[in-house]
Amino acid sequence: MLASQSVFVVDAHTTGTPIRVVTGGIPPLKGASVAEKMEDMRRNHDWLRTCIMQQPRGFLSLVGAILTEPCSPEADYGVFYIDSLTYQPMCGAGTLSVAKVLVETGMVKRVEPETKIVLETPTGLVTVYVKWENHMVASINLENVPAFLYRKDLHIDLAGYGDVSVDIGYGGNFFVLADVHSLGLTITKDTVNLLRSLSKDILAAANKVIKVAHPTNPAINYLDQVLFCQNVPEEDGGYLAQCIFGDAQADISPCGTGTSTRLAQRYFRGLIGLEETFVQKSVCGGAFHAKGLRETTLGGVPAIVPYVSCSDVHITGFNHLIVEENDKLKNGFVSW
């Protein structure tokens, strides 16, 4: 056996969403920021993304995290996110799993009762607080990048539904926030495939009438995720949501950046105050508890700093991926 490439990964999950944290095997990435390093991988090493994330080594719903040397002196590590289709500057569920991997493998020194980790992402610096009880991780808490409501009541022409009002928000990624009740739908395991299909039409319709641009990070200028929201709470007070990302992939977790975005939506619509807890749930039973820590501004745009907590983050395995030179499928593939 002649292996031309080795990649070391730690697999984890955040409320069921599979996260693959790449800890070794990526060539040194060039750039003066993690955003530039992500672009270097996109331009010059994209075959590694497809190799790691696609079949036969990966699968469609897998989320990847690439650890790098940070460029900011404040950060412990740099990180950006990948999936089978593309790159993402931020992933909340992924960041929670990254923190779990860093503390459990000794890549960051464990400090009890709380370990603080600063990560440089293409969206900016985020801080993660790992809380310990009885020498075990009890919860992982993300102080995310500022979140804001980009556009209220945007009207789109949605095929089969006519005129539909949605909001556009940002919490690490840009989202179309769609109220499922206004579409005559609910969020259940049985409707997820319908929501996946509908997300493509929603994104196409929204991108026809709006061009997004982050107020201080011009490279973040694309709208490619939909967060379907049930705005009537469950009996336990939580709110169901379903994020659709990538190639119409359904997030298994409640979605960390989506939770941050929805928190900002509710805050700027006057439905919740700072330090009030908002619980976003997935149909698979996962829950993220979020609150707004404080107000801020981004290039004059009002925003809040979200704090997202989860107690269901676990390591599932350690893997040494190899690429044999004569493997015809070494670059990966997507079947269906």
Give the residues covered by each predicted segment:
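Glycine-rich ThDP/TPP pyrophosphate-binding loop and its adjacent helix/strand module
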Residues: 172
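A glycine-rich beta-to-alpha transition motif near the start of alpha/beta enzyme domains, typified by
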Residues: 1-167, 176-336
